[in-house]
A protein has these predicted regions:
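Short hydrophobic/aromatic beta-strand micro-patches
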Residues: 80-82
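Catalytic activation segment of kinase domains across protein kinase-like and atypical kinase folds
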Residues: 77
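Catalytic core of pol beta-like nucleotidyltransferases
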Residues: 1-62, 68-74, 84-155
Length: 155
């Protein structure tokens, strides 16, 4: 993470973040994207997932979807997490919904969004979650937000 400028860039003409992975501090993320009650509610759900992922050893979460666009009231958020160092037994015991990627409704009920491992294959696209998250519905490239869970304090 050293050397990354931690400033979320302005949106492009389509309301998306410019191409790339944009590292942000939690406070900046909340300030930028938590600008109404709906968004703050989604952030609360995201925080629950982030606490569980950090406790299980995940180092990074990537946030995507309409939540990181100019849409004023997104329906949910989409996220994927670095699972290289995750203790899956910890998740299985403490956060089983994070391991059930097919129960999207269950994830949305608990976390108010959908969360996948970065290397989770997506349908028949031949790509994983991390790659898919960097494209819009028309498959044009766009940016996403990254939060360093190792630096993140949730107290």
């Amino acid at each position: 993470m050293l050397g990354y400028k931690r400033v979320i860039p302005e949106f492009d003409e389509n309301g998306n973040l410019p191409l790339g992975v944009h590292w942000a501090e939690w406070e900046e993320f909340v300030e930028r994207f938590g600008n109404n009650e709906r968004r703050l509610s989604l952030i609360q759900g995201l925080q629950i997932a982030m606490k569980q992922l950090k406790a299980a050893g995940s180092r990074t979460i990537y946030i995507n979807g309409s939540f990181v666009t100019t849409k004023s009231k997104p329906g949910d958020f989409d996220a994927c997490y670095d699972n290289e160092t995750v203790d899956t037994d910890c998740l299985r015991i403490n956060a089983p919904r994070l391991l059930n990627h097919y129960d999207r409704a269950g994830q949305k009920a608990k976390y108010r969004g959908e969360i996948f491992p970065v290397n989770q294959p997506v349908g028949n696209y031949g790509i994983n979650s991390f790659e898919l998250f960097q494209r819009n519905r028309n498959r044009n490239k766009k940016g996403i937000i990254a939060i360093d869970l190792m630096r993140w304090n949730y107290d």
